[in-house]
UniProtKB/Swiss-Prot annotation:
Its cofactor is Zn(2+). Keywords: Hydrolase, Metal-binding, Zinc. This is Probable phosphatase ASA_1316. PANTHER family: PHOSPHATASE YCDX-RELATED. It comes from Aeromonas salmonicida (strain A449). NCBIfam families: PRK09248.1 (NF006702). Zn(2+) 1 binds at H8, H10, E74, D193.
Length: 246
């Protein structure tokens, strides 16, 4: 199956990344990516952009040469209460919010704390998807998290970079998440987690896992712009008419 949506990319606004949004566009066109989200790190990361960066994303065109650009953030889950590092009052400026654990903001501790923090973020209503939940540095009760994600209609990310260089040891956890999501009715999203444009739309490992698990295609948000946009609208995000023809 051809996947045409990438929900996790970073730009030079996160200074450990190396591409601009403009850099992503020709690669998106060449690879058949119809829609991608720009999701720079939330402000509590040391090298993240100021929250004004996210507030000002409205200056971006919706569609450039047939490629749609979603305005997003990879926020940080800050504590066991599931709070994230983006002001509620500006949330409407974004099309989607992804959130996850990052060591500089939430130091790894124990499975029970990680699990409760992630479930509380899911329950908060603010988070549309959870980034790299299979990170072995943050062990979780997979069944409990996936059950909450299914109940609250929050997508779980398969992060392709976790299998190659970012989070070694993720594969078994991600496989278990896919199987639990299949059985419990949760949605999956695919993220390249590109920190340079050359990896946009690389879902090699994501595709392999969902194929091996016989995961239902209709719960994979990367399959089409409409699949992702319908999911976000079902969560109360605004309809974006400019994306009608993607």
């Amino acid at each position: 199956m051809k996947y045409t949506v990438d929900t996790h990319t970073h730009t030079v606004a996160s200074t450990h990344a190396y591409s601009t949004i403009h850099d992503y566009l020709p690669i998106a066109r060449a690879r058949g990516i119809k829609l991608f989200a720009t999701t720079d790190h939330g402000p509590d990361m040391a090298d993240a952009p100021h929250f004004w960066h996210f507030v000002n994303l409205h200056v971006l065109p919706r569609v450039v040469d047939g490629v749609g650009i979603l305005r997003g953030i990879e926020a940080n889950i800050k504590n066991i209460d599931g709070e994230i590092d983006f002001p509620v009052r500006y949330e409407s400026r974004l099309d989607m919010i992804m959130a996850g654990f990052h060591e500089p903001v939430f130091p790894p501790c124990d499975q029970a704390t990680h699990t409760q923090a992630m479930i509380n973020a899911i329950r908060s209503g603010r988070v549309d998807m959870i980034s790299h939940p299979g990170n072995p540095a943050f062990p979780i009760d997979i069944q409990a998290v996936v059950k909450a994600a299914a109940q609250y209609r929050v997508a779980l990310e398969l992060n392709n970079s976790s299998f190659s260089h970012s989070r070694p040891g993720s594969e078994n956890n991600c496989g278990a998440i896919v199987e639990a999501a299949r059985d419990l009715g949760a949605y999956l999203t695919f993220g390249s987690d590109s920190h340079v444009a050359f990896s946009l739309g690389n879902f090699e490992h994501c595709h392999r896992l969902v194929t091996e698990a016989h995961f239902p295609e209709d719960r994979i948000l990367a399959r089409s712009p409409r699949a992702l946009l319908d999911f976000l609208e079902s969560r109360g995000r605004a309809h974006i008419p400019e994306f009608a023809d993607l």
